[in-house]
Regions:
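Solvent-exposed, non-transmembrane regions of membrane-associated and secreted proteins
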Residues: 1-177
């Protein structure tokens, strides 16, 4: 099952974190190398651009990006095989290194699978205990504090068009968003 496959991938990351000094350095650019815990997975699938994890949930997944096939991972697993669950992926026009807003897509499935666990944020106490999302790029660890939670109908004229905002012209525009 796909859930077991995600657990195996997460186990590889955790094992690499524990064995960090033994992992080979994999250069991504002249200036940056891939973090040791993600090197093996990147070699397995270079569409991987990061990792998302939220403590207290099952969210602990690789994050993919395929600009030329934007929704590829909506219905494909990490091994690029067909899968109803897919893999979380970043919107095609987001630049992982410089965009102000990274839109990460993933299925909302009941029973806490995939991003279904985000429903827990309806509970103020849960939010109070889980205010941080870990999102690592291949080269940097990152932690982000949740400042808002909303539910909207995507691509609806009445919905919040979060997917239209990638970069702000200035700080005021970013804050207004």
């Amino acid at each position: 099952e796909q859930t077991e496959a995600f657990e195996e991938i997460a186990d590889k990351v955790e094992q690499a974190q524990e064995d960090g000094s033994q992992a080979p350095e994999i250069p991504l650019t002249e200036e940056e190398s891939i973090l040791p815990e993600y090197g093996e997975l990147f070699l397995q699938n270079p569409d991987m651009v990061g990792w998302i994890k939220i403590e207290g949930t099952n969210i602990n997944y690789p994050v993919m990006q395929t600009p030329n096939e934007p929704n590829f991972y909506l219905k494909h697993n990490f091994e690029k095989e067909y899968s109803d669950l897919g893999v979380p992926y970043i919107q095609e026009d987001c630049d992982i290194a410089s965009s102000d807003n990274l839109v990460i897509y993933g299925h909302h499935i009941k029973g806490q699978k995939m991003f279904g666990a985000l429903e827990s944020y309806k509970d103020k106490d849960f939010y109070g205990e889980h205010k941080v999302i870990q999102f690592d790029t291949l080269t940097q660890h990152g932690e982000y504090e949740i400042i808002a939670v909303f539910k909207t109908v995507a691509y609806s004229s009445e919905g919040f068009r979060y997917y239209d905002f990638i970069n702000a012209e200035n700080e005021d525009e970013f804050n207004a968003y």
